[in-house]
């Protein structure tokens, strides 16, 4: 390792080469997380509901979390999204257009006791799901 008066170029080159041993740097530069992300790096995405599914909560909890299978419009990928709120699943029907966003787990993964679910439903047919659950808005008839 040079540390002399004129060693700056070698120091800089070595530092740049060694950055690739940092997993986070390498994944960022190669765009691996964006490639693997169904939303392709976007904060939200729209999709069509294929079916309603119940996902069993992980131990020690015991519940069936109400989710929906969604096919994204932009790339055709299928993801599972959680319907947040008491009775929220009743406002979602098959073939509805929903907007989803990340559930907020660490490193873009799932959160809490819902295994394999990385997204939440925010809107159904362009109306906020939360507003419908609280009773402020009605689901539009198509």
UniProtKB/Swiss-Prot annotation:
Keywords: Ribonucleoprotein, Ribosomal protein, RNA-binding, rRNA-binding
Gene Ontology terms: cellular component: small ribosomal subunit
The organism's place on the tree of life at top rank: Archaea
Family matches, as Pfam families: Ribosom_S12_S23
GO MF annotations, alphabetized: rRNA binding; structural constituent of ribosome
InterPro entries: NA-bd_OB-fold (IPR012340), Ribosomal_uS12 (IPR006032), Ribosomal_uS12_arc (IPR022863), Ribosomal_uS12_euk/arc (IPR005680)
GO biological process: translation
Family: Belongs to the universal ribosomal protein uS12 family.
Subunit structure: Part of the 30S ribosomal subunit.
Task of the protein: With S4 and S5 plays an important role in translational accuracy. Located at the interface of the 30S and 50S subunits.
Protein's recorded name: Small ribosomal subunit protein uS12
Species of provenance: Methanoculleus marisnigri (strain ATCC 35101 / DSM 1498 / JR1)
């Amino acid at each position: 390792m040079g540390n002399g008066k004129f060693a700056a170029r070698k120091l800089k080159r070595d530092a740049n080469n060694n950055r690739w041993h940092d997993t986070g740097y390498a994944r960022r530069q190669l765009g691996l997380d964006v490639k693997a992300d169904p939303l392709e790096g976007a904060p939200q995405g729209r999709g069509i509901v294929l079916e309603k599914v119940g996902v069993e909560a992980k131990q020690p909890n015991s519940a069936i979390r109400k989710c929906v299978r969604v096919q994204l419009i932009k790339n055709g990928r299928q993801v599972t999204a959680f319907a947040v709120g008491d009775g929220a699943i009743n406002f979602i029907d098959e073939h509805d257009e929903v907007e989803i966003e990340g559930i907020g787990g660490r490193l873009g993964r799932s959160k809490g006791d819902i295994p394999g679910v990385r997204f939440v439903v925010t809107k159904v047919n362009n109306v906020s799901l939360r507003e419908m659950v609280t009773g402020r808005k009605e689901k539009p008839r198509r």
